[in-house]
Design a protein with these regions (language model features):
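Acetyl-CoA-dependent GNAT
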Residues: 1-64, 75-77, 81
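Conserved glycine-rich acetyl-CoA-binding loop
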Residues: 59-76, 92-100, 104-105
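Conserved GNAT acetyl-CoA-binding A-motif
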Residues: 81-93
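C-terminal "cap" of GNAT-fold acetyltransferases
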Residues: 92-96, 115-130
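Low-complexity, intrinsically disordered Gly/Pro/Thr-rich segments
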Residues: 106-112
Length: 130
């Protein structure tokens, strides 16, 4: 089941172990979609929305739930937001499975960021939604 988390206290509790990473980005422009199975959070997608432009900050699926369409379902749910006209994201150039997923959803590579992930290059990808 996909749900939008809007209570900032729930967000902070949910991501407590990632506090240092995510606290600086939790604001009025941050949205989180979560995926629950048997009342357990197994995946989330964090994005920021400024006017009609969305940026995926992170997408995470617990390892035992990967390659089951959950990440795709979260991205498709995000794309249903009628206010979003374009979506950008960064992905490690070596993360071939993620790149295949993003390509299957219509994302295109628009730039490369040298050394973005601790010396590993990232691809900047874009999808026009409208």
């Amino acid at each position: 089941m996909i749900e939008r988390i809007i209570d900032t206290e729930v967000i902070k509790d949910l991501f407590f172990k990632y506090k240092e990473k995510y606290n600086p980005i939790i604001n009025d422009y941050t949205f989180i979609l979560s995926y629950k199975i048997d009342n357990k959070y197994v995946a989330f997608l964090i994005y920021q929305l400024l006017y009609e432009k969305a940026e995926v900050i992170d997408i995470f699926v617990l390892e035992e739930y990967r390659r089951k369409g959950i990440g795709k379902a979260l991205l498709e749910e995000m794309m249903k937001d009628k206010t979003i006209e374009s979506i950008t994201l960064e992905v490690k150039e070596s993360n071939k499975n993620a790149i295949l997923l993003y390509n299957s959803l219509g994302f295109k590579e628009v730039a490369k960021r040298k050394g973005y992930y601790n010396g590993v290059d990232a691809l900047l990808m874009l999808k026009e939604v409208k």
